[in-house]
Amino acid sequence: LIVAEESDTNSAQREEIATTLKGKTVQSSTAVRYEELSKTAGKENDKQSITLLATDDAYNFNEYLTLRDRKTHQPQILVNNGAVISERLAEMLNVSVGDTFTVNDENGAQRTIKVAGISEMYIGHFIFMNAQCYEHVFGDQYSTNAYMVRLKDHSNANTERQGAKFMKLAAVRGVVQNTTQKNMVSTIVGSLNQIMEVLILVAVLLAVVILYDLTNLNVSERIRE
């Protein structure tokens, strides 16, 4: 879960979030910077939504989100001079490690980001960076406005239940859940499996037809002989 705070919270409201984060259903949490960026790109050249997550605890960030190279499975480390971006975002922007690209922040200002790594991630567009990189890119002092939350029970039902619980808090602006993405992946995989089953069945039937035709051909030739 990503739990985003309202910008104008008071101490009592923040304490309410802190108490919930210490609840029995939560395994651990870490404060992060969460922003929604945008970029006009893609095949249709339309506005794409990009999620930014920045942290001042890069060492433990992989406990909440796995960043790794798709081919080598090597961990992607958050460094000061560039960001790690999701694989789909890299493909959409046609960028590689060492390249730079621009995005628009929530106020419409254009920001330039250098690609330090590309992480295996098949759904959504994401940018990950450490606090030093954030300050360099946005020219602002790093501050947190959200929490990444690990739940003890990772089931979809519990994730949705805990997300709804956080949404009831006055200081919470929104909750981002990964259940939708997980369901989408499951649906895609299920559809691909069905397609593969159909293709295998067609291949088997085609092989039977070919063998039948070859057998008839051999029989006909022997009769003529």
Model-derived segments and spans:
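Hydrophobic, regular-secondary-structure patches
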Residues: L1-S49, N156, E160-K168, G174
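Small-residue transmembrane helix packing/gating motifs
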Residues: I77, I118-H154, T179
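Peri-transmembrane interface segments
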Residues: T159-V208, N218-E221
